[in-house]
Amino acid sequence: MVDTVQAVLPADAGANGNKRGSIAMVAGEASGDLLASLLLEGLRARLGESVDYAGIGGHRMMAQGFVSHWPMETLSVNGYVEVLGSLREILATRREIREQLLARPPLCFIGVDAPDFNFGLEVPLRRAGIPVVHFVSPSIWAWRGGRIRTIARAVDHILCLFPFEPEIYAKAGIPATYVGHPLADVIPMVPDVAGARAKLALPEGKRIVAVLPGSRQSEVRNLGATFFAAMDRMHRMDGNLAFVLPVASAPLREIVAGLHAQYPDIDLTVVDGQSHLAMESADVVLLASGTATLEAALYKKPMVISYKVPWLTAQIMKRQGYLPYVGLPNILSGRFVVPELLQDDATPEALARETLLQLNDEGNIAFLRQHFTTMHETLKRDTAKLAAGVVVDLMRSRGVV
């Protein structure tokens, strides 16, 4: 962790050549890193090299010239109970970022997802006159709708990934723009299954099951054992299956290796990152609820969505939720189009059974391919360009660029 203001943001333009200043960004996990990297691409296209970018980000953001001064993993914690173990570090990080950004104000602050962390940072920054944009609306239409009052104090503009969201914010007087979902720009309309399998060196002649138990260690600890037991059952029910499992970090690879050792007969390929290739290669996907469910839909894949959290977290979420489903494909469809097995329903037997049903139902596979193609077309909007345009317009309206 950095100790000085000087280390967080670059010096002002007078001391840094032709630089106008810096845009500060905070992204909290792998999905936010991807979204932010595309926004950075759009900003760099609009602003050239006149602006620096710094804060918290991942490897995709850093590939766009972003400088991350705190580990993104600090924020990669989910759930009410689970976050308590990391709360002191999270709050200390947020306090340090706030103090340093207030001491050396950026041209703009962009919070990317991670709403519980970012809104607490955005409120004082906006109060200090720093333009604030939040990229990714929290799911206020699904649960914790009261957060919209905090959002009204936290942001000057919110960038929405789904077409129904701006109307919700308009009713609360919050400027919001639908920019489409950047994943719809990144993921091809027609997946190259054979190409993905070749790149991952997957076994030939077998049907492929992609398994994604999550990108956070807490998720993999909650779901990993159940998913591996389900994989073992599928392997014993159908010997023509091979599995591919992407891991987002070295610690996750260690957890997965320990689980695989318990089921050595499973034909499993573990890959570092490359979750998109894993899904593109698959005939069916078994995965944790989250952004990956939308990615699987954009790859036009049948899937089974699952999730497990500690009992207390589940009770809190249940009391604050409004919808009967948690997976993005179902939420965007307004109905169940793929099965969800959550909490006590997520047994190895049920997961194996539902995954094989999804794999073998040709009529349902054809329906999902068409349904998800229509969804893809709705979400494809050149997000990087639209989102960057909103940010630049806000900064120009404030006279900072």
UniProtKB/Swiss-Prot annotation:
Keywords from the UniProt entry: Glycosyltransferase, Lipid A biosynthesis, Lipid biosynthesis, Lipid metabolism, Transferase
GO molecular function: lipid-A-disaccharide synthase activity; phospholipid binding
SUPFAM superfamilies, per the entry: UDP-Glycosyltransferase/glycogen phosphorylase
EC top class, as a word: transferase
Catalyzed reaction equations: a lipid X + a UDP-2-N,3-O-bis[(3R)-3-hydroxyacyl]-alpha-D-glucosamine = a lipid A disaccharide + UDP + H(+)
Record pathway: Bacterial outer membrane biogenesis; LPS lipid A biosynthesis
Biological process annotations from GO: lipid A biosynthetic process
InterPro entries reported for this sequence: Glyco_trans_19
Organism domain of life: Bacteria
GO cellular component, one term: membrane
EC nos: 2.4.1.182
Family that this chain belongs to: Belongs to the LpxB family.
NCBIfam families with a match to the protein in the record: lpxB
Its job: Condensation of UDP-2,3-diacylglucosamine and 2,3-diacylglucosamine-1-phosphate to form lipid A disaccharide, a precursor of lipid A, a phosphorylated glycolipid that anchors the lipopolysaccharide to the outer membrane of the cell.
Protein name: Lipid-A-disaccharide synthase
